């Protein structure tokens, strides 16, 4: 049976927040002993806690786990280690009692992988999963992971496959959605950062038959050839879509996006 690293993260979280309250660090071995796992397996747990802190814009809690050198291991990316003390100070200065353990959903037997699988296998399960996962940061990670799976790790507009550059873009903006829509992969597109920004700024969109529409402006005549290729040249082309039709952007979500962001009907006929 696969090990549920999220359940381990749930048990690790209070240990780290207690260390933060005491302004102390903890070694990999000490943490492993505290939760009953080998110290070499700690990195798999810290991956989830680190990602959560980054997504939720929290101080880098995993900076507290140090090796024999007194520094975090090679997998730590949440803070510049050239400024290690400042990273520690931000963690020590945070009142972690204000933060709910974000991994509580694991107590029902859920893992990140199992929830992502549910979202992709049955998109309508999104409302129920949203109610089980209380942390917005975890919800955002789940949504991105589900889109990565649905879109086979490729940007819908360019087919770029470098995961670090890919983001989860909501069709109906998060602030305008109902709970059942926030984790629905049919209300999302996997996009690179550049096109995600243009999509949210109403410079680029998709039609209900999944073609790309770019909104030109007079000042666009001064854009570079690279920008031209990534915008004007995409106009009218078919977006890269999930293989399974049930995972593709839903027309009702696309129409609502057009309404909210001011896209006129003639603009989205290509």
Regions found by a protein language model. Give the residues of each.
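Residue-level detection of the helix-turn-helix DNA-binding "recognition helix"
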Residues: 36, 47, 160
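A detector for short metal-coordination/catalytic motifs
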Residues: 138, 142, 160-166, 171-270
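Short, basic alpha-helical nucleic acid-contact segments in DNA-binding proteins
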Residues: 41-45, 49-61
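Short, charged surface segments at domain edges that flank catalytic/cofactor-binding sites
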Residues: 118-154, 172-185
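Amphipathic alpha-helical interaction segments
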Residues: 23, 38, 53-57, 199-202
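Short, hydrophobic/aromatic alpha-helical segments in well-folded domains
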Residues: 15, 27, 143, 154, ...
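Positively charged, aromatic-accented nucleic-acid-binding surfaces
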Residues: 1-25, 29-37, 61-124, 260, ...
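A structural signal for short, well-ordered beta-strand segments and their strand-loop junctions
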Residues: 25-27, 156-157, 167
């Amino acid at each position: 049976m696969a090990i549920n690293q999220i359940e381990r993260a749930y048990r690790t979280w209070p240990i780290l927040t207690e260390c933060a309250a005491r302004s102390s660090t903890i070694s990999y071995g000490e943490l492993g002993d505290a939760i009953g796992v080998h110290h070499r397996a700690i990195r798999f747990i810290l991956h989830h806690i680190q990602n959560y802190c980054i997504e939720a814009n929290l101080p880098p809690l995993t900076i507290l786990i140090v090796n024999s050198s007194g520094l975090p291991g090679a997998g730590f990316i949440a803070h510049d280690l050239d400024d290690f003390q400042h990273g520690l100070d931000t963690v020590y200065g945070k009142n972690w009692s204000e933060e709910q353990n974000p991994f509580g959903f694991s107590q029902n037997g859920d893992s990140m992988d199992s929830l992502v699988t549910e979202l992709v296998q049955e998109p309508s399960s999104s409302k129920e999963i949203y109610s089980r996962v209380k942390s917005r940061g975890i919800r955002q990670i789940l949504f991105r992971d589900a889109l990565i799976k649905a879109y086979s790790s490729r940007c819908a507009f360019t087919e770029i496959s470098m995961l670090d550059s890919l983001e989860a873009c909501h069709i109906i903006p998060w602030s305008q959605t109902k709970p059942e829509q926030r984790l629905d992969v049919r209300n999302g597109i996997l996009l690179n950062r550049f096109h995600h920004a243009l999509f949210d700024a109403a410079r680029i969109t998709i039609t209900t038959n999944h073609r790309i529409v770019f909104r030109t402006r007079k000042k666009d005549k001064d854009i570079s050839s690279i920008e031209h290729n990534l915008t004007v040249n995409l106009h009218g082309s078919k977006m890269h879509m999930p293989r399974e039709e049930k995972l593709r952007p839903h027309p009702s979500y696309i129409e609502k996006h057009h309404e909210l962001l001011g896209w006129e009907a003639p603009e989205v006929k290509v």
